[in-house]
Amino acid sequence: LHIGHVFSYTHADVIARYKRMTGKQVFYPMGWDDNGLPTERRVENYFGVRCDPSLPYDPSFSPPEKAPEQKISISRKNFVELCHQLTQADEVVFKDLWRNLGVSIDWTLEYSTISAHAQAISQRGFLEMLQRGEVYSSVAPTLWDVDFRTAVSQAELEDRERPGNYHRVAFKKADGSGSIEIETTRPELLPSCVALVAHPDDERFKALFGTNVITPLFSVEVPILAHELADPEKGAGIAMICTFGDTTDVTWWRELSLPTRALIGRDGRFLPAEFGSEQFPSTDAPSANAFYAGLEGKTVNQVRASIVEGLTQSGALIGELKPITHPVKFYEKGERPLEIVTSRQWFVATLKHREALLKRGEELSWHPDFMKHRYKSWVEGLNVDWNISRQRFFGVPFPAWYPTDANGTIDFDAPILPELSELPIDPSSDVPKGFSEAKRNQPNGFVGDPDVMDTWATSSLTPQIAGHWGTELFEKIFPMDLRPQAHEIIRTWLFSTVVRSHFQENSLPFKNALISGWVLDPDRKKMSKSVGNVVTPMPLIETHGADALRYWAASGRPGTDTAIDEAQMKIGRRLAIKTLNASKFVLGRLEGITIPSPAQITEPIDRDFIALLANVVNEATAAFNTYDYARALERTEAFFWTFCDNYVELVKTRAYGEGENATEAGTSSARATLAITLSVLQRLLAPFIPFVTEEVWRWWHDGSVHVAPWPVLAELGNVTPSRDSAVYEQVCEVLEAVRREKSTQKVSQKNEVELLKIDGPAELLGAIRNGETDLKNAGGVKAFELNESATLSITVTLSPLAI
């Protein structure tokens, strides 16, 4: 875990703490997203192992203490056991971090996405979608990571800028009348070419539509076709369609009903091919096969080099290569560019529900509102159904077996499904009803589905998993109120959860989405393990304290990227320490005094101050109710400092019952204002700095501040501002002038003022008269001179001894 997790988890926690204080029963679970490719890769590297599903389970296996240089092959069950072992150890560390941070999770609601409970929920959801026709199995072009050797979904892609070259290649016309030149960055796909394509309105190629050309090196006759996705401005304006270079190739292949000549295997190497066959017709099969024999089994880069050399020698490569830098699709956790491989996968039918899913996005309340456009853009840009199959090991298995006929051929169209009461099941070890283990992988027997679900296929059901789908609890909490998350997983976690809830419950899964930004490094670059600029949180907690770290996190507004800033953490630490000291100071003046009533607040300056406090309560509450926690903190913190720096200094003499003109009513008014304000501020700050507020709250209250009622105007009574409005603000302005003059003269703030002369409008002077005694005590003023004038003027004359 890094500082970015602390950032977003703090945002969720301050909301949970606020809601709890308003009297809500807060459902706040902790889920561990254990399964998936990152966990497998970590286990492989940590233990020095790799999974080989063909190996038998070894119950005595124990990984070496130090990971060997050469990875050890182990069975799937042994591998999964190591995944559980490592994730459980990680969770202990993670849990310790969240507790140190003060995240107020209900640990009785803890769950894991790989637990038996989560697997049963995931498998039930899959079976019910299958029954409703919302999920289907198909052999189709699939986005494929050749290192992980698994399918990935559109949501898991990212573009990375990579160098490349445009290759201008000549295709001879089939009628011998000349040639057509195309430009491509992937000449290695030439043996997979099935057509050329241009825009239907491109005058350069209109006369060629319906004619054929011959592929260089392989002599395969392919048509020239028209399609609106062809870009007249890109390359030569006419493109090569191959099976498959990118998702546009897939679209052309599907919409133009083209043949399949897929040659890249799951390991990223070129598969065998027989030119002259029905799949690879060639007018010069011997030559084509002779050339292709040198490509079979090679990597993409190796084949590219061989093809370019062959094109050069044949004269089909026109001119020099044109260097470019262009975006290349990668799996977000992968190291090599994605390929498109034909394979059998399970898909969720999302494309035909696009409009309904867009409508769901409009129904959802987004915080901040502009984040809805990211969801909308994602849904509008979908070009394939959601692939939920992964060819990996540590995940939720698909609950399906398939019968085999007398020849051992698998019938994928007639899956054998378990009863819901049998879930969770693992088809690689469990046996379907009516069969015995001896019939596994045999003719007239069965095979288990070998794949596991995409991690988002499980995480998309977090409301059902955490809420115990089908129970009274689930009926009570669904749909949930809030989904807090980061913006980069809108297209994955949020979208997939909306999809599943739309299908399963015909509703949104939650009413609000609170979206956090990224944490940036000091150079304002996104933190990334691969870049090496990740900051871990525990050293920061040890240095500055959890309250300080939370303060920094809560200062980042929803949806806004925020740089890590230890200076901001120091401010948070100062706030926590000041809360401690101010509480100690105020409570020292209230010792032995019962909690006062607002009715005791009678002095004009006190009434004005409480009126300002009421405004802060209103503003902080309104901000929290719109999930703008940063605004609530900003407003509360600003008022806290004016309370400490100004109000406490103004009234502390009166609160002691000391000074000239001291009265019992004046003392009582000051003490009541101090006590009520301290109580309110401690509660307003509690969601942000929970440790120090809990400490000071228990000094004078029973129970926890975190279940104390959130401040409301009713507890401030009927206190209204004084007749002379803005007494407190005007007195503070004068006090600041006194302090400024003392600082300018480089004398102690304790030094006295011989004369404080104030010229100003009558209303302002009336306000100052109402606070004259407090101002005299706080500023050390011996004498006042108040004169009416149109504008305010303050003259401070320090005592001679002070100069």
Predicted ranges, named:
Residues L1-D201, L225, C242-E278, L311-L357, ...:
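N-terminal, positively charged nucleic-acid-binding surface of large information/translation enzymes
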Residues F148, F218, G334-R336, T404-A406, ...:
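Short Cys/His-rich metal-coordination motifs, predominantly Zn2+-binding knuckles/fingers
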Residues G4-A16, W32-D33, A118-I121, S179-G310, ...:
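Structured ligand/cofactor/substrate-binding pocket environments in proteins
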Residues V14, P64-Q70, K95-G102, S219-D231, ...:
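Active-site-adjacent bridging/hinge elements
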Residues R168, V384-A457, L461, F503-A546, ...:
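Feature 926 captures the class I aminoacyl-tRNA synthetase adenylation module centered on the KMSKS loop
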Residues V139-P141, C193-A195, V341-S343, Y402, ...:
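Short hydrophobic alpha-helical segments that form membrane-spanning helices or hydrophobic packing faces
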Residues G48-K77, E278-L295, D413-R440:
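Charged, glycine/proline-rich intrinsically disordered loops and linkers
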Residues V49-L55, R76-E81, E296, M538, ...:
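Short, polar/flexible loop-turn hinges at active-site or ligand-entry regions and domain interfaces
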